[in-house]
């Protein structure tokens, strides 16, 4: 399905935190609009994620990191009231996978947190990265940092863990509000993007491997 109904559907409900916009008139605003137009047209998602000819890879990555941050915030917002210290005492994906939080600041060592606390810290951390113009420069006159791809990989890897937790522990809520098709479409878009640019390791993708092979069948 096309993703054109995604934002309309989720913006009716609860947003976990404010959406991060792109500044009008910038290259990334134009790329964002181009990507949105492709999604709304229902084009094959494997083709949608490819770097447009002549465009800068870092700009393309930046646009998608912010977009996925916004979309996954919206998805988590629909289940956040059911995700608390009691229902989800650890940030996990079933019994086999548990994620520890470390940010080099408040949590210098990997620390077990509830899913709610982990995701709150994660979204704060990502927001800090996105708002830091030394990491996500607004002006084309300012170069991206040399480690921008590594930072993007870390952000996308951690956002994937939110998908893992939501799919394994809260998918009944997603189904109950009729959001299954929207969430699956967003996941497919995310998965094809991280595969196209090798942004997440195969080991990190393991928790949703079976589901991924079932729903991600778009041909090249």
From Swiss-Prot:
Keywords: Metal-binding, Zinc
Xref: Pfam families: Mob1_phocein
SUPFAM superfamilies reported for this sequence: Mob1/phocein
GO MF entries: metal ion binding; protein kinase activator activity; protein kinase binding
InterPro entries, per database record: MOB_kinase_act_fam, MOB_kinase_act_sf
Gene3D superfamilies per UniProt: MOB kinase activator
Residue positions binding Zn(2+): 83, 88, 165, 170
GO biological process, one term: signal transduction
Keyword Metal-binding (UniProt): yes
Gene Ontology cellular-component annotations: cytoplasm; nucleus
Family designation: Belongs to the MOB1/phocein family.
Protein's name in the database: MOB kinase activator-like 3
Organism: Drosophila melanogaster (Fruit fly)
